[in-house]
């Protein structure tokens, strides 16, 4: 299980870990924090070495899963709702309030 703010720039989690441990890399750090590329391209390529990668950053109406990446920012801080994901089973506690 991995957790990042926005997305993973690498094809595998171990590669990202190696890059981050090698020292500061502004491009990698910015991608992890700000990228919306996967969502914009509907890229369902999984990140190898993980069961699931949990990300946020881009508010959506519903949780969206692309490959093994779970986009769980549903705008709870604004006008949306908070999404709760049970990590053991990868099930949403309340997929969409009111439904």
Annotated model-derived regions:
Residues 1-71, 75-80, 89-98:
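Acidic, His/Gly-enriched loop-helix segments that form or flank divalent-metal centers
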């Amino acid at each position: 299980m991995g957790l990042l703010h926005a997305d993973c720039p690498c094809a595998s989690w171990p590669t990202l870990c190696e890059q981050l441990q090698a020292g500061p890399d502004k491009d990698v750090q910015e991608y992890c924090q700000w990228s919306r590329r996967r969502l914009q391209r509907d890229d369902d390529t999984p990140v190898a070495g993980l069961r699931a990668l949990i990300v946020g950053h881009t508010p959506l109406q519903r949780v969206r899963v692309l490959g093994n990446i779970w986009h769980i920012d549903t705008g709870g801080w604004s006008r949306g709702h908070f999404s709760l994901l049970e990590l053991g089973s990868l099930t949403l506690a309340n997929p969409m309030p009111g439904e």
